[in-house]
């Protein structure tokens, strides 16, 4: 059982996933700090010194902190846009690599076709008497 677990845990995609989760968590903290400590205070300043983190209203005994919700939405938008940019870049690189591979295959195919024609001509010359 231990060997099975070790084989499972050491598979490349599991390790990649673990690394992605750790980096993603750290990136999330950076974005949260960016939004809470830099972007939202600047937006609040532009809106007349409004502090979004303190925006709330009470409904009976319940306190609805919609300012915190707004900050979370901004976090989400920044993270989503960042992921979009990374995926877009990776897809572009992948398409470029595939195009290069296709071009290389076409070059090999053209070369192969030329070699076949030469072979056929040589066979034809060998069969025909001089």
UniProtKB/Swiss-Prot annotation:
Record GO biological process: monoatomic ion transport
Membrane-related topology note: Multi-pass membrane protein
Keyword Oxidoreductase: no
Residue ranges, Cytoplasmic side: 1-14, 86-130
Keywords: Cell membrane, Ion channel, Ion transport, Membrane, Transmembrane, Transmembrane helix, Transport
InterPro entries for this protein: Mechanosensitive_channel_CS, MS_channel, MSC/AndL, MscL_channel
Pfam families per UniProt: MscL
Segments on the Extracellular side according to the record's topology features: 44-65
Subcellular location(s) per record: Cell membrane
Molecular function, one GO term: mechanosensitive monoatomic ion channel activity
Keyword check for Nucleus: no
HAMAP family the record matches: MscL (MF_00115)
Name by which UniProt lists this protein: Large-conductance mechanosensitive channel
